[in-house]
């Protein structure tokens, strides 16, 4: 008899689930904020949740759908959030009214690696930022430059040997060997040769941290749930690996700086200075002891930021040089002249002072901003200036750098690679919010100077010895890998690397 009731039960269940997973979908309509129509369960993230498109591409598409709106109401799964398009509003959120949007809002267990500068919020973030910002000053990076230089020389030797066997390279994986070497040396004081037995482990770590976990979608649907359950988005094997690595290094150095001027030395110097404190009036006084766990968390985020983002940016830069030989010719001429002026050496100042190289780098980041989207959480109710729209406390605010960087209102022919966009005169004409590869304001990327320096050094070294040419397998229409957390090339990037003395 119960079989007769089964259709009715299923119907009730389906209707109940439908109502539950659409219960918030009138949120923005009630506030007269336009936005794309959400899909049951997925909200506006169906393609990224199913790993059909990268989240950065999805955000760009939503940005483009509403060219005349200052803000766009959307849904991450069932949770309402706001995509901001207007520069005036972006500037208020990121700079002028920073205290109302100081948190990134990525909420999960802050035990282990979770207590890192990127994911920390509130006064914990402020305390970490105040203490760790000096690590990335120009002076500190200059002292660390010799470590990068050693890694770059070893990398060029490796490429030279490989060029004796072949011309075509998949440059993304190739450049990861350079950034792995540099980060291992600059962060942990470990030479690449001595960690060759750990390369396989590092590759596993890279795969895990470069591909999104569905824990992210769970956080979208049920904000704060991961934190309440004390769950982390960082897998346990990754946490164990970095804890073991950092513990061994601290033990080898007896908990004291070893005179290498690397990241670990600088952190151990900070620990000798005592607790990290913050006395911002909003939250009273917060003290944070620099424990081994805190050190491990910062080393983790330093590795992730410097390893993957730099390798990907350089890969895209080399890709564009292969397709734009006129740009490459001009850049090689600048590199040759700069090295000649430095008595045949590549110094810190050599790299920093090459204007065209820096413009090429900036244009690469315009076309391929690696971290998408930028995210902030409202710490209080906030009325958007000049509107009746109120962003309620705990609402996520998103910004699409890629959407902005490809907007023809700000960049003519945005799909064309043109480093001259970054002539000083051209930059002066644009709003500062028109270029956001590293974010903006106090929560911009603290390691951007390091990433930029190691990348510019490597490109300089490469072009001093080689030319980049398209190969028969160079994809003229690169797609973005949908499964990665960051923007990255689907299927890699294949080009020919040719010693300059035998240019074809």
From Swiss-Prot:
Cofactor(s) the protein requires to work: heme
Induction: By treatment with the monoterpene, alpha-pinene.
Cysteine-cysteine disulfides: none
Intracellular or extracellular location(s): Endoplasmic reticulum membrane; Microsome membrane
GO molecular function: heme binding; iron ion binding; oxidoreductase activity, acting on paired donors, with incorporation or reduction of molecular oxygen, reduced flavin or flavoprotein as one donor, and incorporation of one atom of oxygen
Residues binding heme, per UniProt: 445
UniProt topology in membrane: Peripheral membrane protein
This protein's record includes keyword Oxidoreductase: yes
Keywords tagged on the record: Endoplasmic reticulum, Heme, Iron, Membrane, Metal-binding, Microsome, Monooxygenase, Oxidoreductase
Major subcellular location class: endoplasmic reticulum
Xref: Gene3D superfamilies: Cytochrome P450
Pfam families: p450
Catalytic activity: an organic molecule + reduced [NADPH--hemoprotein reductase] + O2 = an alcohol + oxidized [NADPH--hemoprotein reductase] + H2O + H(+)
Keyword Translocase among UniProt keywords: no
Superkingdom assignment: Eukaryota
E.C. numbers: 1.14.14.1
Record-level GO cellular component terms: endoplasmic reticulum membrane
Family statement: Belongs to the cytochrome P450 family.
Protein name: Cytochrome P450 6B7
Organism: Helicoverpa armigera
Gene that this sequence comes from: CYP6B7
């Amino acid at each position: 008899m119960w079989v007769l009731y089964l259709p009715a039960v299923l119907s009730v269940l389906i209707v109940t689930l439908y109502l539950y997973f659409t219960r918030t979908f009138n949120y923005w309509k009630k506030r007269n904020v336009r936005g794309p129509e959400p899909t049951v369960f997925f909200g506006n993230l169906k393609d990224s949740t199913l790993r059909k498109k990268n989240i950065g591409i999805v955000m760009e598409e939503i940005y483009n759908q509403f060219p005349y709106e200052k803000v766009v109401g959307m849904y991450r799964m069932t949770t309402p959030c706001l995509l901001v398009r207007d520069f005036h509003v972006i500037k208020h959120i990121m700079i002028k009214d920073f205290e109302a949007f100081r948190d990134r809002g990525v909420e999960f267990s802050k035990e282990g690696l979770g207590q890192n500068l990127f994911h920390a919020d509130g006064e914990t973030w402020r305390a970490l930022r105040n203490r760790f910002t000096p690590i990335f000053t120009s002076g500190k990076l200059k002292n660390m430059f010799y470590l990068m230089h050693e890694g770059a020389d070893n990398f060029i030797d490796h490429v030279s040997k490989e060029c004796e066997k072949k011309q075509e390279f998949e440059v993304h994986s190739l450049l990861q060997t350079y950034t792995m070497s540099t980060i291992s040396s600059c962060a942990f004081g470990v030479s690449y040769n001595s960690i060759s037995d750990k390369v396989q482990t590092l590759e596993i770590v890279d795969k895990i941290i470069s591909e999104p976990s569905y824990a992210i979608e769970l956080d979208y649907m049920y904000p704060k749930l991961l934190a309440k359950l004390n769950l982390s988005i960082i897998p346990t094997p990754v946490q164990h690996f970095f804890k073991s690595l950092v513990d061994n290094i601290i033990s080898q150095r007896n908990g004291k700086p070893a005179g290498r001027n690397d990241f670990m030395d600088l952190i151990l110097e900070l620990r000798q200075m005592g607790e990290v404190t913050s006395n911002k009036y909003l939250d009273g006084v917060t003290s944070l002891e620099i424990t081994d766990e805190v050190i491990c968390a910062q080393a983790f985020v330093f590795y992730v930021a410097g390893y993957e983002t730099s390798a990907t940016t350089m890969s895209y830069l080399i890709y564009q040089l292969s397709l734009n030989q006129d740009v490459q010719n001009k850049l090689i001429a600048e590199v040759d002249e700069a090295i000649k002026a430095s008595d045949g050496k590549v110094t810190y100042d050599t790299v920093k002072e090459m204007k065209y190289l820096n413009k090429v780098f900036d244009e690469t980041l315009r076309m391929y901003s690696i971290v998408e989207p930028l995210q902030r959480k409202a710490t209080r109710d906030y009325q958007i200036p000049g509107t009746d729209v109120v962003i309620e406390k705990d609402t996520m605010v998103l910004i699409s750098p890629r959407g902005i960087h490809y907007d023809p209102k700000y960049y003519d022919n945005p799909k064309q690679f043109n480093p001259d966009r970054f002539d000083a005169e051209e930059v002066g004409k644009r709003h500062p919010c028109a270029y956001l590869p590293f974010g903006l304001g106090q929560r911009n990327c603290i390691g951007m100077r390091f990433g930029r320096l190691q990348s510019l050094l490597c490109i300089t070294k490469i072009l001093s010895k080689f030319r980049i040419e398209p190969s028969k397998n160079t994809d003229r229409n690169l797609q973005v890998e949908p499964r990665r957390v960051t923007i990255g090339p689907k299927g890699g990037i294949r080009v020919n690397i040719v010693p300059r003395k035998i240019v074809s």
